[in-house]
Amino acid sequence: MKIKNSLKSLKTRHRENRLVRRKGRVYIINKSNPRFKARQG
């Protein structure tokens, strides 16, 4: 999982990327291609 300051550019890297908020953190998840997972921090 990548940890980035800004997820804006990562969101557009793949069509199926989803932006979710869990426990005050912002994540990008991708079920079909998990290598695009990222967390903002």
Swiss-Prot record:
Cited InterPro entries: Ribosomal_bL36, Ribosomal_bL36_sp, Ribosomal_L36_bact
PROSITE patterns (UniProt xref): RIBOSOMAL_L36
Organism of origin: Sinorhizobium fredii (strain NBRC 101917 / NGR234)
Molecular function (Gene Ontology), one example: structural constituent of ribosome
CC per GO annotation: ribonucleoprotein complex; ribosome
Keywords: Ribonucleoprotein, Ribosomal protein
Name of the featured protein: Large ribosomal subunit protein bL36
Single GO biological process annotation from the record: translation
SUPFAM superfamilies, per database record: Ribosomal protein L36
Recorded family membership: Belongs to the bacterial ribosomal protein bL36 family.
Record bears the keyword Ribonucleoprotein: yes
The keyword Ribonucleoprotein is annotated on this UniProt entry: yes
Gene from which the chain derives: rpmJ
